[in-house]
């Protein structure tokens, strides 16, 4: 049992916060998933980062680069600005945040508006660096059963 404070910035203990999600409990919303992913980078949990990325994108992830970035960075904090459920589509959400870290090149911060989709009771991060191969009339890669153009097309940079 961990007695450390969760890296996500909640002030809660890891086991009472993101540790639940790292152990397999589905995150209840996109913001909780995003916070748990930040914590996973801090803790070097690359398998969790891959598992919580949209399944259609997982094969395109660079696991070694993710592990290197995680290990070679000193994580300085996370600030969540907003979490938005998108109009009429509660299974789609954006979370805007700023993550700060230090590496051999100095201090950095990254502000992002990340897209998330919920499918079969689990939230997934839609990685903007990994393309989705889908035509507008093809089934959506998120496995929602909807056409891509009516589902995730507007949330990814295809």
UniProtKB/Swiss-Prot annotation:
InterPro entries: NTF2-like_dom_sf, SEC_C_motif, UPF0225, YchJ-like_M
Any Pfam family: YchJ_M-like
Superkingdom to which the source organism belongs: Bacteria
Family stated for the protein in its record: Belongs to the UPF0225 family.
HAMAP family for the chain: UPF0225
Name of the protein: UPF0225 protein Pput_1155
